[in-house]
Structure formats: C-alpha cells, structure tokens
A protein has these predicted regions:
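Short, hydrophobic beta-strand segments that form beta-sheet elements in well-ordered domains
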Residues: 37-40, 99-102, 147
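NAD(P)+-binding Rossmann beta1-loop-alpha1 motif at the extreme N-terminus of oxidoreductases
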Residues: 1-66
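Rossmann-like NAD(P)(H) cofactor-binding subdomain of soluble oxidoreductases
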Residues: 43, 47, 52, 57-135
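Interdomain hinge/lid region at the active-site interface
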Residues: 202, 215-255
Length: 255
C-alpha cells in the first residue's frame, strides 16, 4: 500500500466528463486526491475536461479503471447498469477498489457486478444542478449529498461528500427512487412555474420579467423551504431519512 493511500489520499479516475463528473473530479482534487484520468467521448466533454481538469489525461475507460483506487461513475442513470455490468464481464473491477456512482435514482444494488468482483460500492448524489464550470465548485460548499452504502463502508461515502464540501445525509437503498422523484419534482416544477410566470409578464409587455419575479420567487421558495427544515442535527452528524437503517444499505449521473 502506498504512503498516499495510508494517508487517505486516493488515485481517482472519472468515467464521464459531463457537467457532474468534471466538477466532482475537480472537487476531489481540491481535497488532495490525485486524478489518474478521465474518459470523455463527445467534443463537449473533451472541452469540459480540458477546461476543468487541464492536467488530467483523457483515457479509455478500461485504462482509467486500471489506474485508479477510486472510480467515479458520472454517467446518465439509464447507462449505469449496462456500463457496470459490461465492465464486470470484461474483468475490469478489482478487489478493494472504491466504485462511486452519482445517479440519484440508484443505491448500491446497481453496482452488484462490481461488488461481486470485490469492489466497494458507494452511491453519492449531490442535490444541486450543475453548469459544468468552476462556478459549481463554490456552490458545492454546503450542498446536501445523498449517500447510500453498506454499513461498514458508509463512513467512507460520508467522508467523500464532506471532502467535496457537502453535507451528507443517508438514504436507504429502498428509498432512492422516492429521493430521485423528489429531486426531479423540485427541479422541473420550479423551472416550469418561473417560465410560465415570466411568459405571462412578457405577454403584457413587462420588461425584464426575470428580474421582476426574482425577489418574489426567492422569498416564496425560502419561506416554503423553511417550513420543511427543522434546522441542524443536534450532534452535528449526518442526517438519516426514513428507512435509512435498512441493513442492506443504510444511507447521487449527470444531473
């Protein structure tokens, strides 16, 4: 085991240079981890990788995995099961390797093919939208991260969330679907409502409808959120939602 590994520093490889992957990789680098490589297929993802991670090599997926102690899977949720299974069939995963995915809807069961090869499965989803730029690194501070992991390694998932600037809370394997629905609802409905209201104002000739609505929307949303926020936990530890003590996995894809 290397001195860096003993000190808790990991070689991190990222699969997917979308808005989420590039930002989280940069956040882990900021916490002192070494970035071993990133996979990027499209022109946009290659440009993003070059902008956010200029000294990190763009490599084929198998090579990224081979180089890494922690593999960050930041791919669309619908691609995750086949990716994990295909890599397992190719013998890519190895014992003791940390495999982290960022899809809101999945817990760690989707990583079973990697786990059967001896890898350690973790699900970590930051509850925020991403631009894929350095602005997101600042926004990560204080963002809540949904974490799901087997009980013995749950502290690893929580620690990674904290290292990226976030506040971890634990979501049970069985509750990941409900969690994802909540995230989707918050994002889609808030966007639709603002678009509808702005369209009505623009229709009657109101200039800068977004600026007119901004104070009202922010205040309304803040008041609504306050009704559902009991404040910080007494012991300062990670929050746990209903069912999160499920023995299977107590406890997010480009969002």
């Amino acid at each position: 085991m290397s001195a860096d590994r003993r000190a808790g520093r990991l070689g991190v490889g990222t699969i997917g240079a979308g808005r989420v992957g590039a930002v989280l990789a940069a956040a882990l680098a900021g916490a002192g981890h070494a970035l071993t490589g990133i996979s990027a297929v499209s022109d946009a993802s290659r440009e993003r990788a070059a902008a956010m991670l200029p000294n990190v090599p763009v490599l084929p997926i198998p090579e990224v995995i081979e180089r890494s102690e922690l593999v960050l899977l930041a791919v669309p949720a619908d691609e995750l099961p086949s990716l994990v299974g295909g890599l397992a069939a190719a013998g890519a995963w190895r014992p003791g390797q940390l495999v982290v995915h960022t899809a809101a809807r999945y817990g760690v069961d989707v990583l079973d093919p990697a786990r059967r090869a001896g890898a350690i499965p973790l699900a970590i989803h930051p509850a925020m939208t991403f631009t894929g730029t350095s602005i997101d690194l600042t926004r990560l501070a204080g963002t809540w991260f949904a974490v799901t992991a087997p009980a013995p390694v749950l502290p690893i998932a929580q620690a990674l969330a904290v290292e990226m600037g976030g506040e971890p809370f634990v979501v049970a394997e069985a509750d990941r679907g409900a969690y994802a629905d909540a995230i989707d609802t918050a994002v889609s409905f808030s966007t639709a409502i603002v678009d509808q209201a702005a369209g009505l104002l623009e229709g009657i000739g109101v200039p800068r409808a977004g600026s007119v609505l901004a104070p009202l929307v922010r205040t309304s949303v803040e008041n609504a959120l306050a009704r559902h926020d009991p404040g910080p936990t007494v012991d300062g530890g990670a929050t746990t939602i209903d069912g999160a003590d499920d023995e299977r996995a107590p406890g997010g894809s480009d969002t």
